[in-house]
Amino acid sequence: MDGTVTLSSTPTAIPPVSALDAGKPTLPPEAPLAMPEQNLREGSLQVRHQRTSPPGIGMRRFYLIGGTFAATAVAVWVMLSVLWPDGISVLEGCLLCLFTLLFAWIAMSFASAVAGFVTVVARAGRKLGIDPEEPLPTLRSRTALLMPTYNEDPRRLLAGLQAIYESVAETGQLEHFDFFVLSDTTREHIGRAEELVYSELCDRVDGHGRIFYRRRADNAARKAGNVADWVRRFGGRYPQMLILDADSVMTGDTIVRLVAGMENNPDVGLIQTLPAVVNGQTLFARMQQFGGRVYGPIIAFGVAWWHGAESNYWGHNAIIRTHAFADHAGLPSLRGRKPFGGHVLSHDFVEAALMRRGGWAMHMVPYLQGSYEEGPPTLTDLLIRDRRWCQGNLQHAKVVSAKGLHWISRMHMLIGIGHYFTAPMWGLLMLIGIGIPLAGVGIDLAGDLPFSPARYWHGSSQGNAIWIFICTMFVLLAPKLLGYIALLLNPRELRACGGAFRAAVSILLETVLAALMAPVVMYLQSRGVFEVLAGKDSGWDAQVRDDGKLSWPALLRSYGGLTVFGLFMGAVAYAVSPALAAWMGPVIVGMALSIPVVALTSLRRTGMALRRAGIFCIPEELDPPKVLVRASELRRAAVLEPSLI
């Protein structure tokens, strides 16, 4: 007998297995755990100051908010000096309001990045007794690794899980772990393929009784409902659960240290890692993973520095205390119709906020490496996923006022909402920039305008206008600069990124490509916001993992309208003034060239050619961890197998 049990009955509090599972589930005996639905209109913050909160957390947050306010106040004062000489019109007043909000947005990111840079360079920020340089701790409790999936290629999915399983086994502590494949697949042929590949995996690694599989008959509430179903049925057996994504890979060493961190800190409810993006092959995927590897730590260490014990949850590559999650993270259905009503889409932010309300500490450990994920292969795939995130984040407008939330939890949600509203705000800023001269404000259309933004905005404050531009660009680009400096101070990682020169070329090329794609992102994010506000639901589709091929008809359908709009905006700007057209050139060019830029960055051969030249290299490519090598081997072997889907 291999220890595997297929359930035939359940307690009366849980529906019969036949109603819960499709196909042929292979599951352990149930250990039910109550997970009540939370009330957003009632509740109070249980613990105001956490034991594990870093010292001086109040001053850290004062620095962030005070620094943001001070920098924004100076920038607004200088902008006023540019606009004030002839009085401020209605359009200029709108411009000033937008500028204030947008500068505050980038100033806060800058202040956080500076804190992150100092933390990275000082090799500080370690917490919860989790030290990757110490000997591997011995575990005392049992942990479940959960891998939710939805219409994914099962061979690819379980290749990653096998690599994780083998890595955990190499730590010598496999007996403390069980693995669950939690399928929400709706396509019957993929479901049957999952069962076959799962059975092959168990045979291959002798995982019977340790690796389990089930497919929900009703995938209500998407991923959040998938995990909640497991918690309610099996959570009572496991003090911790580690949530993976379909493309997640983690080392056994990192997993063991996360579990030990939970065991040694009984008041901690969640520990979030910083997943490094790997395995990119297209130009777009490679520039994204390079940026995440070089700038990502600066940003992540910064937010972890001021988040303290009120960190956020990103939905995967994180370990969670099961009973804390069950007690406080049962999500209610929001009132109203979609897209704002119904099930909570971006569930991770809300679950973290509710757990913190319940008195549990939430931490992020960006210094703990060995946590990986994959990025979308093309800008189109990123924007499809981003549209779903847009709806989920805007839906938080119904949650942010919930009773008893910690103010930092509310701030997380407001930042998430603001992330999507900045896109239409930048667009409005650009349109007002053309609207002011068209309205005859502060410009002589018949006059000779030299190339000077200050002459465009009133001739008397040229120095201040240029100063605003330089400062804005510096604040925008500072995280990249700080990331490069931190890389220079780490010789080992610098070599792995191709050396100082190639890393600098990579950063420059990434900045240029990102600038060209920024108008595309701005346009489509703005459209996404308006679609959500108009009541259009995003749906739920499986993600593209590998192939970055895009057909020209698909590109024309997706970006043809944006190309025409960019050409039209360029013509209008040139009609107003060649100087204005030149000043708006980066935005206009990005829109007008959206089709070739997206096509170029979607090519695998372009990305791999740059890799051979040492551009966009990351340490995980020069010296890949064993778990990534193994996952890649298994996925390559899976490609050679007959297709099951």
Curated annotation (Swiss-Prot):
Its main location: membrane. Residues 1-22 are annotated as: Disordered. GO terms for cellular component: plasma membrane. The chain crosses the membrane at residues 64-84, 98-118, 423-443, 465-485, 504-524, 559-579, 580-600. Its EC number is 2.4.1.-. GO terms for molecular function: hexosyltransferase activity. It is a multi-pass membrane protein. It is found in: Cell inner membrane. Keywords: Cell inner membrane, Cell membrane, Glycosyltransferase, Membrane, Transferase, Transmembrane, Transmembrane helix. Gene3D superfamilies: Spore Coat Polysaccharide Biosynthesis Protein SpsA, Chain A. Pathway: Glycan metabolism; osmoregulated periplasmic glucan (OPG) biosynthesis. The keyword Cell inner membrane applies. One of its GO terms (biological process) is glucan biosynthetic process. Residues 1-12 have a biased composition (Polar residues). InterPro entries: Glucans_biosynth_gluTrFase_H (IPR023725), Glyco_trans_2-like (IPR001173), Glycosyltr_2/OpgH_subfam (IPR050321), Nucleotide-diphossugar_trans (IPR029044). The keyword Acyltransferase does not apply. Belongs to the glycosyltransferase 2 family. OpgH subfamily. Involved in the biosynthesis of osmoregulated periplasmic glucans (OPGs). This is Glucans biosynthesis glucosyltransferase H. It comes from Xanthomonas oryzae pv. oryzae (strain MAFF 311018). The gene is opgH.
